[in-house]
Amino acid sequence: MKPVFLDFEQPIAELTNKIDELRFVQDESAVDISDEIHRLQKKSNDLTKSIFSKLTPAQISQVSRHPQRPYTLDYIEALFTDFEELHGDRHFADDYAIVGGLARFNGQSVMVVGHQKGRDTKEKIRRNFGMPRPEGYRKALRLMKTAEKFGLPVMTFIDTPGAYPGIGAEERGQSEAIGKNLYELTRLRVPVLCTVIGEGGSGGALAVAVGDYVNMLQYSTYSVISPEGCASILWKTAEKAADAAQALGITADRLQRLDLVDTVIKEPLGGAHRDFGQTMKNVKAVLEKQLHEAQSIPLADLLSRRFDRIMAYGKFSEQ
């Protein structure tokens, strides 16, 4: 797959194109230019490190939405075995913006649930761009309650711009579905591990992100509203999105300092989409450790800690 570069990555893109050209020349001729290729590759890596070491919140928001970033089904394929997808909310329909089912994690049976976006136009429409309707959240809750019944840990992956705001979704009780998930998740009598892998958009993300451990990938975001939405409300123009991103504190490091996130999972150089394999290794290592810890904590303490965490959301500082 040809890499897609964001606007602030254009200097990296130019070097990458030059490297590709030199590799083509070397393959098509007897000239050995490997030293020059290695020199440019090192220069590209150094440039990438430099750019990504000082990303602004707005730029991190762009990385979190990168079209080649791994989605929930990619994590399921890499981290789990024997995945059996479960469908439907038993009330209205099956929402393809939420995927989930039974699987094995290191041989242990678990329930995995997450948002799913699409790669191409057809799939994006089918998945509603990762924006669940009420039936998606009700499906997620049905799966998590099933996990509780059989004593299975729950692992969730969060990646959504937000809950779908359409008229039909509101008529079918979007806010009720989200609110019920928040209520039930605080009482779910099994370990719950949550990982934000891309966009963590408002209540649409929180509805499957109330857990004993909440993780964020290094270049993911988590916020009550998108920077563009915030800018449109406060400044009446989306052009102020960069200012909004700065004010909202959407980044993983910032949220960890506020004790809203347990672990910031390091991403490969250039972001998770540049090296799926390393990303999966990093995520798996964290989930293995947290699952072991969660299963050693008495259930009463686990539930108390989970409740205290969600009740701490919404605090603010006047500084």
UniProtKB/Swiss-Prot annotation:
Residues 39-293 form the CoA carboxyltransferase C-terminal domain. This is Acetyl-coenzyme A carboxylase carboxyl transferase subunit alpha. Keywords: ATP-binding, Cytoplasm, Fatty acid biosynthesis, Fatty acid metabolism, Lipid biosynthesis, Lipid metabolism, Nucleotide-binding, Transferase. It holds the Pfam family ACCA. HAMAP family: AcetylCoA_CT_alpha. It catalyses: N(6)-carboxybiotinyl-L-lysyl-[protein] + acetyl-CoA = N(6)-biotinyl-L-lysyl-[protein] + malonyl-CoA. One of its GO terms (biological process) is malonyl-CoA biosynthetic process. GO terms for molecular function: acetyl-CoA carboxylase activity; ATP binding; carboxyl- or carbamoyltransferase activity. Belongs to the AccA family. It comes from the Bacteria. It is an enzyme of class 2 (transferase). InterPro entries: Acetyl_CoA_COase_a_su, ClpP/crotonase-like_dom_sf, COA_CT_C. PANTHER family: ACETYL-COENZYME A CARBOXYLASE CARBOXYL TRANSFERASE SUBUNIT ALPHA (PTHR42853), ACETYL-COENZYME A CARBOXYLASE CARBOXYL TRANSFERASE SUBUNIT ALPHA, CHLOROPLASTIC (PTHR42853:SF3). It is found in: Cytoplasm. Pathway: Lipid metabolism; malonyl-CoA biosynthesis; malonyl-CoA from acetyl-CoA: step 1/1. NCBIfam families: accA (TIGR00513), AccA_sub (NF041504), PRK05724.1 (NF004344). Acetyl-CoA carboxylase is a heterohexamer composed of biotin carboxyl carrier protein (AccB), biotin carboxylase (AccC) and two subunits each of ACCase subunit alpha (AccA) and ACCase subunit beta (AccD). Transmembrane segments: none annotated. One of its GO terms (cellular component) is acetyl-CoA carboxylase complex. The keyword Glycoprotein does not apply. Component of the acetyl coenzyme A carboxylase (ACC) complex. First, biotin carboxylase catalyzes the carboxylation of biotin on its carrier protein (BCCP) and then the CO(2) group is transferred by the carboxyltransferase to acetyl-CoA to form malonyl-CoA.
